């Protein structure tokens, strides 16, 4: 199975990006700074996403997820080297530092970096100011405009 590392285990990451990644056969590994959330994700390994549409509410179960603390450098770097897709939903001001971390790894395999942020060309903006050693890192721009209301704490 392909591996995706997603920075940001908040509402957009868990409620929007992870379901799309899993629907496309990616194993999802979240990276976050919230140690309680990281612990909960790693203990439960699953959560539910409730979506509302014109026909009412639908519930989707997201399975087999993991999380890594941003400060756990050794495990994070090893995980990043194995990932084929690296994504973010952390807020535009943090994308450049994440891109720099990925771009300075000496990776020999093809990887894709997508910043799913509420900012035009967030991926390109981050990559334009960083000299990448990773020549196999491809940049894709995306803009996210989806409202994910706060989820109850019991739903992870």
Range-by-range predicted roles:
Residues 2-5, 11-156:
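Substrate/ligand-engaging "lid" and interaction regions
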């Amino acid at each position: 199975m392909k591996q995706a590392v997603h920075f940001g285990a908040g509402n957009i990451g868990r409620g929007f990006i992870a379901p799309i990644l899993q629907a496309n056969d990616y194993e999802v590994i979240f990276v976050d700074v919230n140690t309680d959330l990281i612990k909960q994700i790693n203990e439960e390994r699953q959560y539910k996403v409730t979506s509302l549409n014109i026909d009412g509410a639908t519930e989707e179960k997201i399975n087999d997820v993991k999380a890594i603390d941003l400060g756990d450098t050794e495990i994070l770097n090893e995980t990043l080297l194995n990932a084929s897709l690296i994504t973010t939903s952390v807020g535009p001001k943090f994308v450049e530092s994440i891109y720099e971390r990925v771009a300075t790894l000496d990776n020999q395999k093809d990887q894709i970096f997508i910043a799913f942020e509420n900012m035009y060309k967030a991926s390109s903006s981050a990559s334009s100011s960083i000299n990448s050693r990773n020549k196999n890192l491809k940049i894709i721009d995306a803009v996210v405009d989806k409202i994910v209301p706060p989820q109850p704490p019991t739903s992870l």
